[in-house]
A protein has these predicted regions:
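Conserved glycine-rich cofactor-binding loop
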Residues: 8-9
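Conserved glycine-rich Rossmann-like NAD(P)H-binding loop of the short-chain dehydrogenase/reductase
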Residues: 22-46
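The beta1-alpha1 cofactor-binding region of Rossmann-like NAD(H)/NADP(H)-dependent oxidoreductases
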Residues: 42, 62-74, 105
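Substrate-binding pocket helix/loop in short-chain dehydrogenase/reductase
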Residues: 99-100, 107-109
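A short, exposed helix-loop element centered on a Lys and neighboring polar residues
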Residues: 123-124, 184
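Catalytic loop of short-chain dehydrogenase/reductase
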Residues: 137-192, 204-206
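C-terminal helical subdomain
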Residues: 177, 192, 199-200, 216-268
Length: 268
């Protein structure tokens, strides 16, 4: 049984579909329950229908990950429905891509609530259930923006320099860098237990609904298929927990290292 947050669209939805194709029962979590209810295409109802149509079991859980009250009911609701929990994927995220000097306190608060507090609290709630199974997996979805930009003198032709300067990813990247450190800490503190904790990010941009809506990214840059993230997530959440833990990794290099090819979301 897996919980996947931010699963009404994009990377989260595709991870849920890939897990279901391998036989996992999935609880999918997001704010948008019905089609047309959110600002972007995609909803829990649509993803659940796709999973069920392929023979999978799915529980949609409508919740706002920025709300501590909503966060507190996600794990209990999934466990009550399925009777167990094996995997937690913390994918939901938020940011405002504005010049950092224009970012408001409310932007910082919401970004840290979604991108750091939610993974921390859900992991705390999930851990007793993972321990009860004797093995478990926690996967935090990070971002290449967590990488610190190099110092001056700045290379005007450097892709990452240009993205950070013009894409205003400082707030988002700061929360994801904190998430990477949190991941490494969870992993080492659980190193004597059979619970793997890893962070996974795409190499570059993924053309998800959210990324397209944000805009400002160059289609000539490396665009990674969402299937690569879904396949890499599967590898980090089904291999023996003591085999892969404490990794802060990018999807395509991980798959190359493990000598695993990218499959479709249906597992084919």
């Amino acid at each position: 049984v897996a919980i996947v947050t931010g699963a009404s669209r994009g990377i989260g939805a595709d991870i849920a579909r890939r897990f279901a194709a391998e036989g996992a029962n999935v609880a999918i979590v997001a704010r948008t329950l019905e089609p047309g209810a959110g600002g972007l295409a995609g909803s829990l109802a649509e993803i659940a229908e796709q999973i069920r149509a392929s023979g999978g079991e799915c529980l949609p859980i409508q919740a706002n990950l920025a709300d501590p009250i909503d966060r507190a009911r996600i794990v209990p609701q999934a466990v009550e429905h399925f009777g167990r929990l094996d995997i937690l994927v913390n994918n939901a995220a938020w940011s405002r891509f504005v010049p950092i000097w224009e970012a408001q306190p409310k932007h910082f608060h919401l970004a840290f609530q979604m991108n750091l507090h939610a993974p921390q609290e859900l992991s705390q709630q999930a851990l007793p259930h993972l321990r009860a199974q004797g093995e478990g997996w926690i996967l935090n979805i990070s971002s290449a923006t967590a990488d610190r930009p190099p110092s001056s003198p700045y290379d005007e032709d450097d892709r990452y320099i240009c993205f950070n300067r013009d894409g205003h990813a400082t707030l988002y990247g700061t929360t994801k860098a904190a998430l990477d450190r949190l991941t490494a800490g969870w992993a080492v503190e659980l190193s004597r237990e059979n619970v793997a904790v890893n962070a996974l990010a795409p190499v570059g941009a993924v053309a998800s609904e959210g990324a397209v809506a944000v805009g400002g990214w160059d289609e000539r840059d490396h665009i990674e298929p969402v299937e690569a993230m879904a396949e890499a997530a599967l590898q980090l959440c089904h291999r023996p927990a003591n085999e892969l833990s404490g990794n802060i990794v990018r999807s395509l290099p991980l798959l190359e290292r493990l000598q695993v090819s990218v499959r479709g979301l249906d597992g084919r």
